[in-house]
């Protein structure tokens, strides 16, 4: 088999969606001396199959996050999940956790031509919710979330819980002009 990157290296690869993750993995493999790389699409399908079999076991819940989403819904606020993760994996994870009804809608990888940090996914969610950018808030945990919000013209509130391609989110946010960063 292929060499396995250390966990810290994998953490630095995460943050741009699964396709970007695989691109970064391929670059790492090349740097590790791997001469023949596997087919991209078959690698993607294998990774998705492995993740599907794990049932989200490695995804950690941020304490209070789902209760917060529930409170927003009970207050009549439309809550959409916008993720660069694959739709099938996301829907399965939400169903298995019994939280699929928490969200009014989902915009996932493949739903738009350009994933975050492009604004397309957020614009699709806002439009689908029948809202305006001025009424929306993006709560995210990565630079891609923040940049997508900025590009879509909406407020970004960031939490320090996610992977941010190897750079602490608070540090990155300060240099990029994002001031609303909260501990997870």
Question: What are these language model-derived features?
Answer:
Residues 1-12, 165:
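Active-site neighborhood of HAD-like aspartate-dependent phosphohydrolases
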Residues 3, 99-104, 132-133, 179:
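Conserved H-loop
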Residues 7-13, 38-41, 99-114:
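A short, structured active-site edge motif that brings together acidic residues
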Residues 23-67:
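Metal-dependent phosphoesterase signature
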Residues 53-81, 87, 91, 119:
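Short, acidic loop-to-helix structural element flanking the phosphoryl-transfer center
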Residues 116-128:
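Short loop-to-alpha-helix "cap/lid" segments that border enzyme active sites
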Residues 126, 137-183:
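Acidic, Mg2+-coordinating phosphoryl-transfer loop and its flanking beta/alpha structural elements
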């Amino acid at each position: 088999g292929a060499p396995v990157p250390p966990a810290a290296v994998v953490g630095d690869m995460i943050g741009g969606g699964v396709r970007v993750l695989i691109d970064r993995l391929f670059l790492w493999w090349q740097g590790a001396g791997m001469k023949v790389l596997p087919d991209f699409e078959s690698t993607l399908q294998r990774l998705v199959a492995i993740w599907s079999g794990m049932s989200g076991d490695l995804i950690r819940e941020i304490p209070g996050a789902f209760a917060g989403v529930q409170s927003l819904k009970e207050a009549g606020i439309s809550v959409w999940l916008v993720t660069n993760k694959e739709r099938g994996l996301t829907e399965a994870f939400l169903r298995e956790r019994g939280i699929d009804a928490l969200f009014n809608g989902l915009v996932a990888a493949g739903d738009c031509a350009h994933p975050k940090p492009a604004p397309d996914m957020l614009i699709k969610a806002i439009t689908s919710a029948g809202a305006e950018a001025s009424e929306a808030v993006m709560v995210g945990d990565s630079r891609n979330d923040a940049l997508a919000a900025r590009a879509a013209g909406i407020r970004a509130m960031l939490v320090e819980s996610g992977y941010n391609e190897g750079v602490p989110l608070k540090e990155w946010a300060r240099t990029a002009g994002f001031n609303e960063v909260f501990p997870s």
